[in-house]
């Protein structure tokens, strides 16, 4: 007698009947796998993490969305001359959506895991991103609140010294425009602001930045720059002080005051005449009426430095 279980037709029916169960199991379970080499998820052109949408040529060479606009419809793959049009690589996009990796700031306290395609955007906004010391000759890095304590201990004598009081909402300081980097600090909230002057062929660019991660939950500040000489005035106002993780020498693309050469006394700027005023205001309303948070910067004696350090890092 022929075993009914061995009949090919019955076997086919049995396999088909198991498919709904398998589908149900996959819907009810979260399956995971370990990817040993994350480099396979990087764009072969810019070597940055692939982002959605991802495009491919007919041979399967892929390119990220940003590089796609730069390759002029030509596949960047080695030895490949096929056109790369609007053909999406949905298989890779699905991998990017499902591949979660921990933030690189895990060791500093971040507990978030994000999809691989969003790693770059998350780490730019992560509260635990590491900041660099605003002193250009120092390589120290740490969280933004640690950087404040480091700066006050190591570099206070190099900064623009300004006084501060709790409950006030604005800061007014005078800074010589010939200084490339001036650091303003406020002890109660442990804030570091950097005023930079970039001398270029046609004049000087002046910016104000705050040492802090660019996360939205940090308090916002507005600012006003003004420059006066021989009756001529240049002013610039911005509703928000941009945040940065590291001071650099790159000429700003936006949010700056420009002082043309016609208002400068040549390359060597006269300290007595060419002074700019910086006003920084906090967006949050304080309980006390807004007055000057910082007084105009004044020379500080050596015996005052240690007291200032002690009070500021308590």
Swiss-Prot record:
GO terms for molecular function: transferase activity; zinc ion binding. It catalyses: S-ubiquitinyl-[E2 ubiquitin-conjugating enzyme]-L-cysteine + [acceptor protein]-L-lysine = [E2 ubiquitin-conjugating enzyme]-L-cysteine + N(6)-ubiquitinyl-[acceptor protein]-L-lysine. GO terms for biological process: protein ubiquitination. Residues 13-23 have a biased composition (Basic residues). PROSITE patterns: ZF_SIAH. Pathway: Protein modification; protein ubiquitination. It comes from the Eukaryota. Residues 95-280 are annotated as: SBD. Its EC number is 2.3.2.27. Keywords: Metal-binding, Transferase, Ubl conjugation pathway, Zinc, Zinc-finger. Residues 1-12 have a biased composition (Polar residues). Zn(2+) 1 binds at residues 103, 110, 122, 126. The keyword Metal-binding applies. Residues 1-31 are annotated as: Disordered. A zinc finger (SIAH-type) spans 98-156. InterPro entries: Sina-like_RING (IPR049548), SINL_plant (IPR044286), Znf_RING/FYVE/PHD (IPR013083), Znf_SIAH (IPR013010). Gene3D superfamilies: Zinc/RING finger domain, C3HC4 (zinc finger) (3.30.40.10). A zinc finger (RING-type) spans 43-81. Zn(2+) 2 binds at residues 133, 138, 150, 155. The RING-type zinc finger domain is essential for ubiquitin ligase activity. The SBD domain (substrate-binding domain) mediates the homodimerization and the interaction with substrate proteins. It is related to the TRAF family. E3 ubiquitin-protein ligase that mediates ubiquitination and subsequent proteasomal degradation of target proteins. E3 ubiquitin ligases accept ubiquitin from an E2 ubiquitin-conjugating enzyme in the form of a thioester and then directly transfers the ubiquitin to targeted substrates. It probably triggers the ubiquitin-mediated degradation of different substrates. Belongs to the SINA (Seven in absentia) family. This is E3 ubiquitin-protein ligase SINA-like 11. It comes from Arabidopsis thaliana (Mouse-ear cress).
């Amino acid at each position: 007698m022929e075993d009914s279980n061995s009949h090919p037709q019955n076997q086919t029916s049995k396999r088909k009947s198991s498919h709904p169960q398998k589908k149900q199991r996959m819907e009810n379970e979260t399956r995971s796998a370990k990817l040993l080499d994350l480099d396979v998820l990087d764009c072969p052109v810019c070597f940055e993490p692939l982002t959605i949408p991802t495009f491919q040529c007919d041979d399967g060479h892929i390119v990220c969305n940003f590089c796609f606009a730069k390759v002029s419809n030509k596949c960047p793959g080695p030895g490949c001359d096929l056109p790369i049009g609007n053909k999406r690589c949905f298989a890779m996009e699905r991998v990017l959506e499902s591949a979660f990796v921990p933030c690189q700031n895990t060791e500093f306290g971040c507990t978030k895991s994000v999809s691989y395609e969003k790693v770059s955007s998350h780490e730019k906004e992560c509260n635990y991103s590491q900041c660099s010391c605003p002193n250009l000759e120092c390589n120290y890095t740490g969280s933004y609140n640690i950087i404040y304590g480091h700066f006050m201990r190591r570099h206070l004598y190099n900064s623009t010294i300004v006084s501060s009081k709790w409950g006030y909402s604005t800061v007014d300081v005078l800074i010589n425009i010939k200084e490339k980097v001036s650091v303003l600090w406020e002890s109660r909230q442990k804030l570091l602001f950097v005023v930079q002057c970039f001398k270029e062929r046609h004049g000087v660019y002046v910016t104000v930045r705050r040492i802090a991660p660019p996360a939205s939950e940090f308090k916002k500040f507005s600012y006003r720059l003004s420059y006066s000489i021989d009756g001529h005035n240049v002013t610039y106002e911005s509703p928000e002080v941009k945040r940065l993780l590291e001071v650099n020498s790159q000429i700003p693309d936006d949010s700056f005051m420009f002082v043309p050469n016609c208002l400068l006394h040549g390359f060597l700027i006269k300290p007595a005449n060419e002074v700019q005023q910086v006003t920084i205001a906090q967006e949050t309303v304080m309980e006390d009426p807004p007055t000057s948070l910082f007084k105009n910067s004044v020379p500080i004696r050596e015996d005052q430095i240690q007291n200032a350090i002690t009070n500021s890092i308590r």
